[in-house]
Amino acid sequence: MTDATLRPPVPQGDYVPASRHGDLIHTSGMTPRRDGVLLSKGPVRNDTPLEEYQEAVQLACGNALTAARGQLVAGERLAGILSLTVYVAAEPGFEAHSRLADYASAFLREALGHQGIGARVAVGVATLPGNAPVEIQLVAFV
């Protein structure tokens, strides 16, 4: 999957997908939705191989990257990612947050090269909007 195949994310509330100040772009949290429809639900389960969540993580990350690129004007490109935050709704006892976040990092590296890798946080939470398994937020620079 490449972010070029994604349509702009559809906000699920009273917010914008991304905002820009100068050369910094902050995205809203993005879940694995296509055309506003959540494609993966439920918490990340301890007994499910991480590979089962790869598509959901990459879709959420692609939505965030698409939102960031939506703030560019003609002739601009994203120069890189400053930070990546990956929220993981998981069952109690889940410990592979960073390994799951690696799917997002790999997606960004493929899309932007070495500039796609910035600081990263992977956080476990009890629930996410719409019962999404992951939510991703980016800070990018132009």
Put a short name on every predicted segment.
Residues 1-84, 90-142:
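N-terminal presequence-like segments and the immediate start of the first folded domain
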